[in-house]
C-alpha cells in the first residue's frame, strides 16, 4: 500500500465517521491541522493518535507552526517569535542569531513531535522586500545570505528534534503585493532578478538536502504563464533540474484564490500532480471532499511515496519526557529572554 498524494484537513477536535471515510480513501496520504482542531496538548495528541491508527502506512500529519502570527497551537505550547526577530538580531550579532534560530527550530519541532505531528510547513524562505504584507515578518530577512544562514540553523534544529523541514514559498513570494489567499499575484520581474535573489535560499538549501518545498501560488509573468505550483518548468526544469532538489514538493492550498484559474478542485489537484508536486494540499472544503474523492478511482501514483515517506517524524517522545528534558527547559528560558511574541 502506498501513501496517497492528497492532504486534507479536519472539521473539529475529534474525528467523525465522514472524516474517517475520507482519510481511509487510497488517494489521501496526509492531514493538515488548524487552530480549530486544537484545544489542548492532550486533546491534539489523542486526535493525531486516532488519525495514525486509521491505516498503514500511517497518514502524515502536518501543521503551519512558523511562530509569530502563524502558530496554530498556542495554549500549552511555547509562543515562538516571528522569523523577522531572528533577522533583526542577525543584523546585530550573526552568531547569536544563528544560535537562537537553531534553538527556535528545535523547540518548535520537539514540542510538535511530543504530540505526534510529523512536520511543520516551515521555514519561510521568502525574502522580505517590504512589499508583501502576507509574508512580512514571516520572513527572516531581505538579504539572501541572511536568510540562508538563519534557515540552515533553524532546519538543523528541526532535524535534531526529528522533524523534516518544508521550505516555502518557492521561488519567492516576497516581491508581490497581492495575497494568494485572495487573488493570483503576478510578479513581473525578470528571470535574472529572481535567479540572483529569491532563488538563492532555495538553491543553497536544496543542495544541502532540504527535505521538502512548497511552491508559491504566484505567476512570474516574464518566466512562465502558469502559477508555479502548476508549472512543470518551475518544478521540474528549475527546482529539480537546475537547483538539484531531490525532496518532496507539496502544493500550497489548492482552495486558495491563487489556484482558481486552473479549474475545479479535481482539475487543480491533477494539474499540480502532473506539474511535479508529490502531494496536493486541499483545505477548508469539507463539502467538496466527498465529491472529489468520489472522482478519484484506483490506486494513486505509487512513485510519489518514497519522497513523502521521508517526511515522517522521528525520535518520538511524550509530553512528560519533554517537560523533564533540561534542553527543553533551557530553550524555553532562552527564548523568554527575548520577550513576548
Curated annotation (Swiss-Prot):
An example molecular function term from Gene Ontology annotations: beta-N-acetylhexosaminidase activity
Enzyme Commission numbers on file: 3.2.1.52
Domain of life, source organism: Bacteria
UniProt KW keywords: Cell cycle, Cell division, Cell shape, Cell wall biogenesis/degradation, Cytoplasm, Glycosidase, Hydrolase, Peptidoglycan synthesis
Localization (cell): Cytoplasm
One GO cellular component term: cytoplasm
Positions that bind substrate: 64, 72, 138, 168-169
NCBIfam families cross-referenced by the UniProt entry: PRK05337.1
Stated role: Plays a role in peptidoglycan recycling by cleaving the terminal beta-1,4-linked N-acetylglucosamine (GlcNAc) from peptide-linked peptidoglycan fragments, giving rise to free GlcNAc, anhydro-N-acetylmuramic acid and anhydro-N-acetylmuramic acid-linked peptides.
Descriptive protein name: Beta-hexosaminidase
The gene coding this protein: nagZ
Amino acid at each position: 500500500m502506498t501513501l496517497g498524494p492528497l492532504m486534507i484537513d479536519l472539521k473539529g477536535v475529534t474525528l467523525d465517521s465522514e472524516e474517517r471515510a475520507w482519510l481511509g480513501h487510497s488517494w489521501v496520504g496526509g492531514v493538515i491541522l488548524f487552530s480549530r482542531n486544537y484545544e489542548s496538548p492532550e486533546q491534539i495528541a489523542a486526535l493525531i493518535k486516532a488519525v495514525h491508527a486509521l491505516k498503514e502506512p500511517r497518514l502524515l500529519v502536518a501543521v503551519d507552526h512558523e511562530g509569530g502570527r502563524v502558530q496554530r497551537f498556542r495554549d500549552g505550547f511555547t509562543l515562538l517569535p516571528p522569523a523577522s526577530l531572528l533577522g533583526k538580531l542577525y543584523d546585530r550579532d550573526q552568531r547569536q542569531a544563528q544560535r537562537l534560530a537553531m534553538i527556535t527550530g528545535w523547540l518548535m519541532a520537539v514540542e510538535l513531535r511530543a504530540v505526534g505531528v510529523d512536520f511543520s510547513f516551515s521555514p519561510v524562505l521568502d525574502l522580505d522586500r517590504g512589499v508583501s504584507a502576507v509574508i512580512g515578518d514571516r520572513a527572516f530577512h531581505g538579504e539572501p545570505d541572511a536568510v540562508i544562514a538563519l534557515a540552515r540553523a533553524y532546519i538543523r534544529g528541526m532535524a535534531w528534534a526529528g522533524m523534516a523541514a518544508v521550505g516555502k514559498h518557492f521561488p519567492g513570494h516576497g516581491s508581490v503585493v497581492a495575497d494568494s489567499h485572495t487573488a493570483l499575484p503576478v510578479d513581473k520581474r525578470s528571470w535574472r532578478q529572481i535567479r540572483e535573489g529569491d532563488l538563492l535560499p532555495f538553491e543553497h538549501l536544496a543542495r544541502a538536502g532540504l527535505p521538502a518545498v512548497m511552491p508559491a501560488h504566484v505567476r512570474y509573468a516574464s518566466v512562465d504563464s502558469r502559477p508555479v505550483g502548476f508549472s512543470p518548468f518551475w518544478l521540474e526544469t528549475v527546482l529539480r533540474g537546475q537547483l538539484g532538489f531531490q525532496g518532496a514538493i507539496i502544493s500550497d492550498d489548492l482552495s486558495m484564490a491563487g489556484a482558481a484559474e486552473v479549474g475545479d478542485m479535481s482539475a487543480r489537484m491533477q494539474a499540480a500532480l502532473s506539474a511535479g508536486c508529490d502531494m496536493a494540499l486541499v483545505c477548508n472544503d469539507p463539502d467538496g471532499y466527498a465529491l472529489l474523492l468520489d472522482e478519484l478511482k484506483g490506486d494513486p501514483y505509487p512513485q510519489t511515496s518514497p519522497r513523502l515517506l521521508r517526511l515522517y517524524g522521528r525520535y518520538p517522545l511524550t509530553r512528560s519526557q519533554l517537560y523533564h528534558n533540561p534542553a527543553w527547559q533551557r530553550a524555553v528560558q532562552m527564548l523568554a529572554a527575548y520577550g513576548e511574541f
